């Protein structure tokens, strides 16, 4: 018997179909590479920005200072957020440097574990927001890992400035039972860290006068916003 050649319409001949496929794949690859080059060449336009919250033992990340500060960070383009959580139940920390140091060591180990998978070099801008003993944890973590970040320290402890936090701004109340305001202020000056002091405010930057405390919170957040908006050093 004689074989008859199968006639394909030009658009669907096997060879033509293969050519179309190659052209489409090539076009997709070229487009993808172009997008990657565009994003790579515009890192200043589309920077990777990360904010990390280091809470205190009893002051979690949804309490006012950390809640509103990270909201401000999100408005400033920090679209990657990490919220740390601690587990610590021992009492008797206040007034006991040894107990406080033990708590710090425990919380620092927990922070190390929670941040172990972070690829720090991929971020163009890193901001640490911290509260109370979390200010010492954040300062130690940045120092030990050489992370070029900025830090906002809410109600820091004396221990915090022994860890030399860099590129930082601090807030403290003069009636804070966890910190001696004068010694912390001196340590902040020696470290080159601006410290905003609030008269008669406690460890939560509150006085008991609700309207006054709301005004204080607004002032703290305005200063926080200004610091966040500054170009990273």
Question: Which stretches of residues belong to each language-model region?
Answer:
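A conserved short beta-strand
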Residues: 147-156
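Short beta-strand/loop motif that positions the catalytic acidic residue
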Residues: 170-172, 176
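Catalytic histidine-centered segment of alpha/beta-hydrolase-like enzymes
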Residues: 201-215
């Amino acid at each position: 018997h004689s074989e008859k050649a199968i006639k394909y319409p030009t658009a669907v001949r096997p060879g033509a179909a293969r050519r179309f496929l190659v052209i489409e794949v090539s076009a997709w690859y070229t487009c993808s590479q172009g997008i990657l080059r565009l994003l790579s060449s515009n890192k200043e336009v589309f920077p990777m920005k990360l904010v990390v919250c280091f809470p205190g033992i009893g002051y979690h990340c949804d309490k006012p200072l950390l809640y509103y500060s990270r909201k401000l960070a999100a408005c400033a383009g920090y679209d990657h957020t990490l919220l740390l959580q601690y587990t610590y139940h021992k009492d008797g920390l206040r007034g006991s440097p040894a107990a406080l140091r033990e708590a710090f060591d425990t919380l620092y180990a927990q922070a190390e574990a929670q941040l172990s998978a972070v690829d720090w070099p991929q971020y163009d801008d890193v901001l640490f927001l911290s509260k109370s003993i979390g200010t010492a944890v954040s300062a130690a973590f940045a120092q030990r890992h050489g992370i070029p970040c900025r830090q906002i320290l809410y109600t820091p402890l004396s221990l915090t400035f022994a860890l030399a936090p860099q590129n930082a701004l601090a807030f403290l109340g003069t009636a804070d039972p966890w910190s001696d305001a004068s010694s912390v202020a001196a340590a902040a000056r020696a470290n080159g860290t601006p410290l905003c002091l609030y008269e008669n405010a406690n460890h939560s930057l509150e006085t008991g006068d609700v309207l006054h405390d709301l005004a204080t919170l607004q002032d703290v957040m305005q200063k926080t916003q200004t610091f966040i908006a500054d170009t990273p050093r």
